Amino acid sequence: MSMSDPIADMLTRIRNAQMVEKTSVAMPSSKLKSAIAQVLKDEGYIDGFAVKTTDGKSQLEISLKYYAGRPVIERIERVSRPGLRIYKGRHDIPTVMNGLGVAIVTTPQGVMTDRKARAAGIGGEVLCYVA
């Protein structure tokens, strides 16, 4: 059976793994998931990630990050979903927690943070909020 929302599944796996203090979490890989993981790494929310292939299936393994025994990601929530896509123009891209968090946006120039999208003057689909 196919998954209806693989991005929500990825975010839920990260959230659940951090609740039980796992050091890493694995999930089926895709280009979009790898791009989201790259943004999380660049913003300092995860230690790193790797794509591993076994038996023709690629797995994305994310190394989770903790500070003083607490997860670095306090909140990770899906915004745009298959049943209700959320698109924002360059002037309407939201800030998360007054700039303390990031909104991950997929644009014609790739997946990036809300700050980079605003600086580039482009809008897109708001995938999730991370704080």
UniProtKB/Swiss-Prot annotation:
N-terminal signal peptide = none
Which cellular component appears as one GO term in the record? ribonucleoprotein complex
Keywords assigned by UniProt? Ribonucleoprotein, Ribosomal protein, RNA-binding, rRNA-binding
This entry's Gene Ontology molecular function terms read: rRNA binding; structural constituent of ribosome
Query: What Gene3D superfamilies does the database record attribute to this sequence?
Result: 3.30.1370.30, 3.30.1490.10
Summarize the subunit comment.
Part of the 30S ribosomal subunit. Contacts proteins S5 and S12.
Family membership: Belongs to the universal ribosomal protein uS8 family.
Quote the protein name from its UniProt record.
Small ribosomal subunit protein uS8
Q: Give the source species.
A: Leptothrix cholodnii (strain ATCC 51168 / LMG 8142 / SP-6)
Protein encoded by which gene: rpsH
